[in-house]
Regions:
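Divalent metal-cofactor coordination and adjacent catalytic microenvironments
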Residues: 1-118
Length: 118
């Protein structure tokens, strides 16, 4: 399975700067699987629309940031009168799903790829 976007597209067109090439490949694969599920696999792999590629890049970054948050532990930290709060993995996952769906609707909402009817 090929990813819907490659690293060159991520850098040059999406203008992404968060992920390196190796990380992008991992997260773009996860984003591609999510997009295939949400579009009922209607994207033609031989002619991938820019909206799909942009959405793939966007969701790749969102997934990376969620993974980073899972491993950092602290959601916020205060130095004066030291205070730390933690975000649960469930909250991080819920936020990722919400942000991914928002990206999906923003990029693909007018393409017909999300249509669930006959």
């Amino acid at each position: 399975m090929n990813n819907y976007a490659n690293y060159a597209y991520y850098q040059d067109t999406y203008k992404g700067a968060v992920l390196d090439a190796a990380s992008f490949d991992v997260y773009a694969r996860q984003a591609t699987v999510y997009l295939k599920l949400q579009t009922s696999n209607r994207v033609d792999d031989n002619s991938i629309p820019d909206e799909v590629k942009m959405c793939c890049c966007d969701i790749s970054e969102l997934t990376y940031k969620a993974d980073k948050a899972r491993h950092s532990g602290a959601a916020s930290e205060k130095v004066g009168s030291y205070s730390v709060s933690y975000e649960s993995n469930a909250d991080i996952d819920k936020k990722l799903m919400s942000e991914s769906y928002t990206s999906l609707i923003a990029w693909l909402g007018t393409t017909g790829l999300l249509y669930r009817g006959l």
